[in-house]
Amino acid sequence: MAKGTKKSESTTAAAKKRSLFVDLEVCAKCPQCVTKCTYFYHPGNNGVVSVREHAAMSVVCRRCENPVCVSVCPREALERDDGGVLRRYVMRCVGCKSCSIACPFGTLLPDVVPYANSVCDYCLGRLQGDESPVCVTICPLQAVRFEEMAGELPKNNHVVDEHLVVHAIPWKKEGVK
């Protein structure tokens, strides 16, 4: 096996062990988002919006047993995954705000679920070159980091998917201990 191939494989393996870590509490303290994303397919779009949406939805959504927002969507743009987290199909969404109006808790705000969006690829191309994602290198408060997440996660850290871990204080139902 060639040396270059071995390095490429080890770099890819290392990239798979690390996750994008978004601290929503720190991120909320930032007066304005200065994070810019050079998402390959949408160079003019801030791809971080997609990561923030995904992170926020995983901790803000009340995960209703029978989510009304999903059933009222005329374009079937919302889907509830096995973990109860809502996922939005951006190409199906027409921005009608039916989901926002139907949400009994008021957590699906148009500001949280923007119409124009891209899908973050976690800068996988940069990871193969052993570089961090652009949002990580630019975030002034280090609310977005790229780090190893091995073993049991600290309290209030939530795995959203294989590349994303979110830190946020979760909501609690009233009367439930």
Question: At which residue positions do the language-model features occur?
Answer:
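N-terminal cysteine/histidine-rich coordination modules
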Residues: 2-27, 31-51, 56
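Acidic/polar residues at beta-strand termini and the immediately following turn/coil
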Residues: 23, 81, 89, 111-112
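Glycine-centered helix-boundary capping/hinge motifs
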Residues: 31, 76, 95-97
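Acidic (E/D-rich), amphipathic helical modules within compact regulatory domains
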Residues: 37, 45-91
